Amino acid sequence: MSREMGELTQTRLQKIWIPHSSSSSVLQRRRGSSIPQFTNSPTMVIMVGLPARGKTYISTKLTRYLNWIGTPTKVFNLGQYRREAVSYRNYEFFRPDNTEAQLIRKQCALAALKDVHKYLSREEGHVAVFDATNTTRERRSLILQFAKEHGYKVFFIESICNDPEIIAENIKQVKLGSPDYIDCDQEKVLEDFLKRIECYEINYQPLDEELDSHLSYIKIFDVGTRYMVNRVQDHVQSRTAYYLMNIHVTPRSIYLCRHGESELNLRGRIGGDSGLSARGKQYAYALANFIRSQGISSLKVWTSHMKRTIQTAEALGVPYEQWKALNEIDAGVCEEMTYEEIQEHYPEEFALRDQDKYRYRYPKGESYEDLVQRLEPVIMELERQENVLVICHQAVMRCLLAYFLDKSSDELPYLKCPLHTVLKLTPVAYGCRVESIYLNVEAVNTHRDKPENVDITREAEEALDTVPAHY
């Protein structure tokens, strides 16, 4: 091991929020997470609202976001517990005078709360999202007592919607495909579901400004036309409220792509700030033709501050916005090196990165974990926008894609984002539809899979086994 490399391995760029013990391994010190622990005690997020008000949509999106920023979160959907306990027949199961069904529903709630306790207290979960109607003060009191007994914080999210068109669209988009209505006539489904809503309306008790003034909550009116926020008490609740005030349900598409092939891509060198190759310039014009063919209304174009994304955007002939946050991951001392050179000069660092690619931070550079934090403002703004084309870089595109597709931190660094390919993301009910469009301009392959042997003592041949070909 060279003296230079030894110094790099032992002298870390410190960005550590949580101190590690002095006996930590080299890998622990290299990981050096920059992610703060957002929770000092677990949080229960409690959904409130009548059926067809978007509670599951909100639960799913919020869970995806919190997991993406590094806060372990899980949804507990009471409807799933109910379906496991009893087969659904019709709306009469939800009648307030159906005492037998009321007992079953309460037992399902208690079973779900038991699983919440297991997740938050034994499985190192930080946030549990309790996705149910919770429309009565009695049910909410039961949950509050449960949270108090176990030392959990509670944050309520109430979705209120009185617009018949929005409610009808939600029923059409989601409920017609519900497991409760498999192989049922659509008109009968609509009739039954509207009667189900009427059953809940009888005893619905919204969160009250005076009676519930001591509680932490956000009320969302008509899918975001107005908000009411009360007693936000910590970081998780603050981020949750801010996130919910930025999302919308307007139909749109997000186009993600990398810059055209660069001169450094051709030579197998990572990072740097080189311009486009001849094929990269050809791709830029192909991208312009593709975007024009889509006939996208009010399209916004975003790039990083790096030459290769700007040159790609210039061919579009439209205004574009530059984001420094979209710059490629900083490879530190390894900038503009080939993988072969990194293995030759810093073999231990190369192995450490393969062992935990998400948390590994390049000496004097960044990790994917750092990059996710850098990109959070981009995600917030993407959620606020309608149609956007983001021209970015491989690591950046992986992070953005992981958010929209709900990929784990283990999967994120290995998502395939090839050059000269556009990914069209269209948000749907509880996820995102992805279309991959290759624009028929050849480019080098820059994707490197995780090698089988990640041990520090491995041979160079094993370390370089998955390195793609380059000039």
Curated annotation (Swiss-Prot):
The active site is at D131, C161, H259, E328. GO terms for molecular function: 6-phosphofructo-2-kinase activity; ATP binding; fructose-2,6-bisphosphate 2-phosphatase activity; fructose-6-phosphate binding; identical protein binding; kinase binding. Pfam families: 6PF2K, His_Phos_1. Synthesis and degradation of fructose 2,6-bisphosphate. Signal peptide: none annotated. GO terms for biological process: animal organ regeneration; carbohydrate phosphorylation; fructose 2,6-bisphosphate metabolic process; fructose metabolic process; negative regulation of glycolytic process through fructose-6-phosphate; positive regulation of glycolytic process through fructose-6-phosphate; response to cAMP; response to glucagon. In the C-terminal section; belongs to the phosphoglycerate mutase family. Residues 251-471 are annotated as: Fructose-2,6-bisphosphatase. Beta-D-fructose 6-phosphate binds at R82, R105, T133, R139, K175, R196, Y200. The modification Phosphoserine is found at S33, S141. GO terms for cellular component: 6-phosphofructo-2-kinase/fructose-2,6-biphosphatase complex; cytosol. Its EC number is 2.7.1.105, 3.1.3.46. Homodimer. CDD domains: HP_PGM_like (cd07067). The record marks H393 as: Transition state stabilizer. Keywords: Acetylation, ATP-binding, Hydrolase, Kinase, Multifunctional enzyme, Nucleotide-binding, Phosphoprotein, Transferase. This is 6-phosphofructo-2-kinase/fructose-2,6-bisphosphatase 1. The modification N-acetylserine is found at S2. It catalyses: beta-D-fructose 2,6-bisphosphate + H2O = beta-D-fructose 6-phosphate + phosphate; beta-D-fructose 6-phosphate + ATP = beta-D-fructose 2,6-bisphosphate + ADP + H(+). Residues 2-250 are annotated as: 6-phosphofructo-2-kinase. ATP binds at residues 49-57, 170-175, 350-353, 394-398, 430. Gene3D superfamilies: P-loop containing nucleotide triphosphate hydrolases, Phosphoglycerate mutase-like. Liver. Beta-D-fructose 2,6-bisphosphate binds at R258, N265, G271, R308, Y339, R353, K357, Y368, Q394, R398.
